[in-house]
Amino acid sequence: MYRPRSMVSPSRFFNPFMVALIVIITVGLLAMTAGLLIHFLAFDKRAYFYHSNFHILNVDYTEALNSPATHEYRTLSERIESMITDAFRESNLRSEFIRTHVVKLRKEGSGVVADVVMKFRSSKRNNKKAIKTRIQSVLQRLSSSGNLEIAPSNGITSLTDQDTENVLTQECGARPDLITLSEERIIGGTQAETGDWPWQVSLQLNNVHHCGGTLISNLWVLTAAHCFRSYSNPQQWTATFGVSTISPRLRVRVRAILAHAEYNSITRDNDIAVVQLDRPVTFTRNIHRVCLPAATQNIMPDSVAYVTGWGSLTYGGNTVTNLQQGEVRIVSSEVCNEPAGYGGSVLPGMLCAGVRSGAVDACQGDSGGPLVQEDTRRLWFVVGIVSWGYQCGLPNKPGVYTRVTAYRNWIRQQTGI
């Protein structure tokens, strides 16, 4: 009997090309859906900054509230920041609120007014005016907390990102995380990035890096006296700003060099100088001043500090062109002066810092540069000036720095700061 040849039904098998095409389209659609979801959940949000002021009703203004270096200024600012933070964490804005920061405490009558910047993160689609109204509503409910009575301002002002940067760079000691009121604090690696240490200065002799320095105002740089032992003519010197010594962001001539009159090149005592710039620098995100400590500020042994500069990476090596950073710890003078260390050569006006293994240290070319520490409000203070040491990075031979607190009055006498 004739049996026709069986035919393969096209409905039972797919062309491999069609299968691959369907898989690709399906994966693409899933990826697009996931991308849109991520975008709307995360990238759809943006930061909003606001400024307000608060009258502290039960605190009298004193001179101690004139500087962020004092215990009184720091304590009151932290109490105000904590009070505002708690208010938003307990409100319906808890998911939008990021951070607040007291920019300045100022006198009004006999009382104190706190200028405050606040950061929120919300969807770009939200009504900006409605957010502002909700913020104002929370602030109006502030009254007292921890024996602190606050009368909030009747209004708040919206700030652009640039406005916020302009406000916060007028404050001393602000690194990028504070300028953006970020929750992140990252200091890693050995090479600094643009803006990481905005007060770092390269003091250049005939346009070649010779010493480091620290910007302490728009006109003055703090450095070491030994930098000028052989070259004290201001006309030979320039100050540059930025992470690179060969392509700086800014170059300014030096007007005057004021080294400590009692600097001793043998004992290295009083190794401190200030340099007056030929013109004031304009503070920006990447160039602004560090905070000076109070004369009474206590520098605790084993506390973390950072040293920065363009010095050589090994003893006897060449200086580098890109700014380097190193994490060290404060070493007590007693330990530093032990026989295995410096055997009594570390004087009261000096400060030791390093690591036990000796792996991180200042070296040639770092002289005059800053040793800085961060306080509890993320403000940075210069506590030391790179001065001397035995070679570089040896165990039991930490770097020796001029102790800035010991010369706080001298700095004020020379600069008015």
From Swiss-Prot:
Quaternary context: Monomer.
GO CC term (a single one): extracellular region
Taxonomic lineage: Eukaryota, Metazoa, Chordata, Craniata, Vertebrata
Transmembrane portions of the chain: 18-38
Record function comment: May play some biological role in the host defense system on the mucous membrane independently of or in cooperation with other substances in airway mucous or bronchial secretions. Plays a role in the proteolytic processing of ACE2. Preferentially cleaves the C-terminal side of arginine residues at the P1 position of certain peptides. Isoform 2 may play a key role in regulating adrenal proliferation by specifically cleaving N-POMC.
UniProt source species: Rattus norvegicus (Rat)
Keyword Hydrolase recorded: yes
Catalytic machinery residues: 226 (charge relay system), 271 (charge relay system), 367 (charge relay system)
GO biological process: proteolysis; regulation of growth
Intracellular or extracellular location(s): Cell membrane
Extracellular side of membrane: 39-417
Family matches, as Gene3D superfamilies: SEA domain, Trypsin-like serine proteases
Domain SEA, residue spans: 46-162
Name the UniProt record assigns to this protein: Transmembrane protease serine 11D
Topological type in the membrane: Single-pass type II membrane protein
Family: Belongs to the peptidase S1 family.
Disulphide-bonded residues: 172-291, 211-227, 336-352, 363-392
EC number per UniProt: 3.4.21.-
Pfam families listed in its UniProt record: SEA (PF01390), Trypsin (PF00089)
Principal place of residence: membrane
Boundaries of every Peptidase S1 domain copy: 186-416
Residue ranges annotated as Cytoplasmic topological domain: 1-17
InterPro entries: Pept_S1A_HAT/DESC1, Peptidase_S1_PA, Peptidase_S1_PA_chymotrypsin, Peptidase_S1A, SEA_dom, SEA_dom_sf, Trypsin_dom, TRYPSIN_HIS
GO molecular function: serine-type endopeptidase activity; serine-type peptidase activity
